UniProtKB/Swiss-Prot annotation:
<dbReference type="Pfam" id="PF01697">
    <property type="entry name" value="Glyco_transf_92"/>
</dbReference>
<feature type="region of interest" description="Disordered">
    <location>
        <begin position="1"/>
        <end position="33"/>
    </location>
</feature>
<comment type="similarity">
    <text>Belongs to the glycosyltransferase 92 family.</text>
</comment>
<keyword id="KW-0328">Glycosyltransferase</keyword>
<dbReference type="InterPro" id="IPR008166">
    <property type="entry name" value="Glyco_transf_92"/>
</dbReference>
<feature type="transmembrane region" description="Helical">
    <location>
        <begin position="43"/>
        <end position="63"/>
    </location>
</feature>
<feature type="domain" description="GT92">
    <location>
        <begin position="314"/>
        <end position="525"/>
    </location>
</feature>
<protein>
    <recommendedName>
        <fullName>Glycosyltransferase family 92 protein Os08g0121900</fullName>
        <ecNumber>2.4.1.-</ecNumber>
    </recommendedName>
</protein>
<dbReference type="GO" id="GO:0005737">
    <property type="term" value="C:cytoplasm"/>
</dbReference>
<dbReference type="GO" id="GO:0016020">
    <property type="term" value="C:membrane"/>
</dbReference>
<keyword id="KW-0472">Membrane</keyword>
<feature type="compositionally biased region" description="Gly residues">
    <location>
        <begin position="16"/>
        <end position="28"/>
    </location>
</feature>
<keyword id="KW-0808">Transferase</keyword>
<keyword id="KW-1133">Transmembrane helix</keyword>
<feature type="compositionally biased region" description="Basic and acidic residues">
    <location>
        <begin position="1"/>
        <end position="10"/>
    </location>
</feature>
<dbReference type="GO" id="GO:0016757">
    <property type="term" value="F:glycosyltransferase activity"/>
</dbReference>
<keyword id="KW-0812">Transmembrane</keyword>
Length: 584
């Protein structure tokens, strides 16, 4: 009964702020009706006023509405004027740095380690990043106005503004936003995204701050999921049990009322108006001293699972996470398209090097690429789990490889041959392939024709493997470490022989490229290059240390075996016979 009462209250939240509520009612409904003569005089005066307005302004709108008449002035409102001028100014590139654009609303602010992330509501229209500023409280200080670091936006998602890190414990806003400044939430304790999985009616929640150990299951009974618009009001939230907890990923039962609510919203999206709070989900610890993590996670429904589909749209897809790798993207996509990859999921971790322009130059009818904004730092494992869920409905197999890694088939087999061989074996859920790490190969400058033909000398022994997985075979916990996942009980992995398939990993490129690795690592449980821990790890460059200082012999390092296999294949298959150029 208590849960039902909570759910009834929760369902009423969906109508909060909608039209027709509050002090509405029919015209003259309160008190007794006026006499008929009085009504006639009132209506005569009313229409005389409308006629006078039409003469004065040159136009008048007569708007009818049920129950209660709604009057609209003949001239657009100040807000409509601002929106109209806003669109025109953006198109003309003439937005003042102090202009206020009514469409821009800050929904969330998160204090990341090196900057502040502002997430705008869907539909927020932004001019170029040089035409507005980040404001830090108190707003009357000229020293607390700074240019944004970058702006990212997608047609079907929120816009992201990356502001420089400001003073601690101050609210942040934008010079063109009409919403009030927002106090940033701290990144180290935050529920940052969530997915609704119709396959088992669960919600997958991604959270920082619970400090679960890598590669191991936590104790789910210690936690519960909390759904609601305001977690400070216990009567207005619904809780559900957590069924698995691992790393930064929690899976809990989706309450029936939440599923119904999400189906009622437009397109299944958890949308809100400017005066309402969104539906959020969080993680709460149970027992004495229980606490609820701050949350910005609005549950997003995955494509509805259809167990009757026997064949998926794509036999092979790829997930990757990258930051500022745009100059290598064309070669990576074109090459893998030629060998049989059909779909790409690119998780963009705060790139500011023009990745969208590069993708726009590629023929969308030939290359099925989805770019997903993933601003969360040190969260690669969570991003891969997120991608595996998104790819599950359309992809039979999904490879998890980096932008500097290229699948290579030294023998006569192809990618499709390998996949067909194991697709008929239902207990095989993961294909593991060895990686060969290539060095600078004597180069001091970036090879003009790409990495596959530019780097030809590598280490003799293979390093850690990478994986191609069946997303349906993954363990519900979605645990993944170094690009391979834990599988469901009864599912197995196989090691693919190096003569059949392997990965060329162009890991140690010319110093101009390699030094960018010192800016930070995306993996959650891997130390950054400048950290003084795990210096001897295989994730590091042997003998390099923690400082971005180029060794004198860098061009000659990591060169034990000359390997022209992939270079020869690329030159044979991709070279234009008329110009001698490669397509990238």
């Amino acid at each position: 009964m208590a849960l039902a009462a909570k759910e009834r209250k929760l369902s009423r939240l969906g109508s909060k702020g909608s039209g027709g509520g509050g002090g509405g009612g029919s015209f003259g409904a309160r008190g007794q009706r006026a006499p008929a003569g009085t009504q006639r005089r009132l209506f005569a005066a009313f229409f005389a006023f409308l006629f006078a307005g039409a003469v004065l302004f040159g136009a008048a709108h007569v708007i009818g509405a049920s129950f209660r008449p709604v009057l609209k002035t003949a001239w657009p409102s100040a807000t409509l004027n601002a929106v109209s001028s806003e669109r025109g100014a953006q198109q003309a590139g003439m937005v003042s740095v102090d202009a206020v654009l009514p469409s821009v609303h800050i929904q969330h602010a998160v204090a990341l380690p090196d900057h502040v992330l502002l997430m705008l509501r869907d539909g927020s229209l932004l001019p170029a990043s040089g035409q507005f500023e980040c404001l830090y409280s108190p707003v009357n200080s000229s020293q607390l106005r700074r240019q944004p670091l970058s702006v990212a936006t997608l047609p079907d998602g929120p816009s992201l503004v990356h502001c420089p890190a400001g003073p601690s414990r101050v609210a942040v806003s934008l010079s063109l936003a009409q919403s009030v400044p927002v106090a940033p939430l701290q990144w180290d304790r935050l529920v940052y995204t969530a997915l609704i999985d119709s396959k088992d009616n669960s919600t997958v929640v991604f959270a920082k701050g619970m400090n679960l150990r890598p590669g191991r299951l936590g104790v789910p009974s210690r936690y519960e999921c909390v759904f609601g618009r305001d977690f400070s009001k216990p009567k207005l939230v619904v809780t559900s049990p957590v069924v698995s907890a691992a790393q930064e990923i929690f899976r809990c039962v989706t309450p029936v009322r939440i599923r119904r609510y999400l189906r009622m919203t437009t397109g299944g999206k958890n949308s809100v108006n400017n005066d309402d709070k969104p539906m959020l989900v969080s993680i709460r610890t149970k027992g004495r001293g229980s606490s609820t993590l701050p949350s910005i996670a609005q549950p997003e429904p995955l494509p509805r699972y259809n167990k009757h589909w026997r064949r998926k749209a794509h036999s092979m897809c790829v997930c990757t996470m990258l930051r500022n790798q745009a100059r290598f993207l064309r070669e990576w996509i074109i090459y893998h398209s030629r060998i049989g990859v059909q779909r790409w999921f690119i998780y963009d971790n705060n790139s500011d090097d023009g990745i969208e322009e590069v993708l726009n130059t590629m023929d969308s009818s030939r290359y099925n690429v989805t770019r997903y904004l993933w601003p969360w730092m040190k969260s690669q494992e969570a991003g891969f789990a997120h991608c595996a869920l998104r790819a599950r409905e359309s992809c039979e197999w999904v490879g998890f490889i980096d932008i500097d890694e290229f699948l290579h088939f030294p023998g006569n087999q192809t990618l499709q041959d390998v996949l067909r061989n194991y697709s008929v074996k239902p207990r095989i859920g993961e294909l593991r392939t060895a990686c060969h790490s290539f060095g600078p190969s004597g180069r001091t400058k970036i090879p003009k024709k790409g990495v596959t033909t530019g780097y030809t000398c590598r280490l003799a022994a293979p390093e850690r493997h990478k994986s191609i997985v069946r997303p349906d075979a993954l363990n519900p916990s979605l645990i993944n470490v170094v690009h391979h996942f834990h599988l469901k009980e009864g599912m197995k992995y196989v090691n693919i022989g190096q003569g059949m398939m392997l990965i060329n990993h162009y890991k140690y490129q010319v110093w101009e490229v390699f030094k960018d690795k010192f800016s930070g690592r995306v993996a959650t449980y891997v130390a950054d290059w400048q950290d003084e821990e795990n210096v001897g790890s295989r994730d590091r460059a042997p003998g390099l240390g923690t400082k971005p200082v180029e060794p004198e012999d860098w061009p000659r390092r990591f060169c034990e075996v000359y390997d022209n296999g992939l270079k020869d294949f690329v030159q044979k298959v991709f070279t234009d016979p008329h110009t001698g150029n490669l397509p990238w």
